[in-house]
Swiss-Prot record:
Its EC number is 2.1.3.15. This is Acetyl-coenzyme A carboxylase carboxyl transferase subunit beta. Pathway: Lipid metabolism; malonyl-CoA biosynthesis; malonyl-CoA from acetyl-CoA: step 1/1. The gene is accD. Zn(2+) binds at residues 27, 30, 46, 49. Residues 23-279 form the CoA carboxyltransferase N-terminal domain. Keywords: ATP-binding, Cytoplasm, Fatty acid biosynthesis, Fatty acid metabolism, Lipid biosynthesis, Lipid metabolism, Metal-binding, Nucleotide-binding, Transferase, Zinc, Zinc-finger.
Length: 279
């Protein structure tokens, strides 16, 4: 028995609209929900707490180079598999899948352009490719970036964003620490400035080699910078670590960094540095 009857037909609704993927971003620090446009307008930082989201090399190039114009070079280098490494998966299969999903070919990109009228070579790491790990291709690209700086007598900026050496390449990866350090010494011998920008994270063999060798070492706020991770150190020494240990602010206080620069001020600060160095 029906007690109630609908006096009017049901309200007509259009087909459900799917929200575009990536329209809202969640801050990993404070948990705030941020609209994509809002994040972009704040240079990919959280407008609530200042957290810096990770950028790709191309995003850094667009942020820093005048009129977003630059020339990428040595983008044809690909990782080899000299050790025939395999853990849960074969190394070449892992690289192939990343290429298929993201289009990324390596953990480093090189470009040359102008920043406020000053020539600058930038070598930028990409955390989206195996955690920005340093393998033989990364070492070679940094080496070629040094060569480009020498060729054009232009300062070099390396943007570090890496978990360290790439375990799949074993000793070949560790060799890049010495290789990049030796090549950077050639810049110093010629009086060509090298600026190191450390972002979150800059760890392992990266921090133990080229990342800490800058004539000027700068960092984004609250970046994790160190060799072994805080948890590993804590478990090894069986002691609690100082508050903020291995964060950029702690390193600045203890003399490891020259300055910490918010991303919105990064190009302006680089322009100042390049202006002082060129004069």
């Amino acid at each position: 028995m029906v007690w109630f009857k609908r006096a009017k037909p049901s309200i007509f609704t259009k087909d459900k609209r799917d929200m575009p993927e990536g329209l809202w971003w969640k801050c990993e620090s404070c948990g705030a929900m941020l609209h994509k446009k809002q994040v972009e307008d704040h240079f990919y930082t959280c407008c609530e707490c200042g957290y810096h989201f990770r950028l790709s090399p191309y995003q850094y190039f667009s942020l820093l180079f005048d009129e977003k114009k630059y020339d990428e070079f040595d983008d044809n280098l690909r990782a080899a598999d000299p050790l025939h490494f395999s853990d849960t998966r074969k190394y070449p299969d892992r690289v192939h899948d990343i290429l298929e999903k993201t289009g990324k070919t390596e953990a480093c990109r090189n470009a040359i352009g102008r920043v406020s009228g000053h020539d600058l070579v930038i070598s930028a790491m990409d955390f989206g490719f195996i955690g920005g790990s340093m393998g033989s291709v990364v070492g070679e690209k940094i080496s070629r970036a040094v060569s480009k700086s020498i060729e054009h007598n232009a300062p070099l900026l390396i943007i570090s964003q890496s978990g360290g050496a790439r375990m799949m390449e074993g000793a070949f990866s560790l060799m890049q620490m010495a290789k990049t350090s030796a090549r950077l010494s050639q810049l110093s011998a010629r009086g060509i400035p090298y600026i190191s920008l450390m972002t979150n994270p800059t760890m392992g063999g990266t921090s133990a080699s080229y990342a800490m060798l800058g004539d000027i070492n700068i960092s984004e706020p609250k970046a994790l910078i160190g060799f072994a991770g805080p948890r590993v150190i804590r478990d090894t020494i069986k002691r609690d670590l100082p508050e903020g240990f291995q964060r950029a602010e702690f390193l600045l206080e203890h003399g490891f960094l020259d300055c910490i620069v918010h991303r919105r001020d990064l190009k302006h600060r680089l322009s100042q540095i390049l202006g002082h160095l060129s004069s």
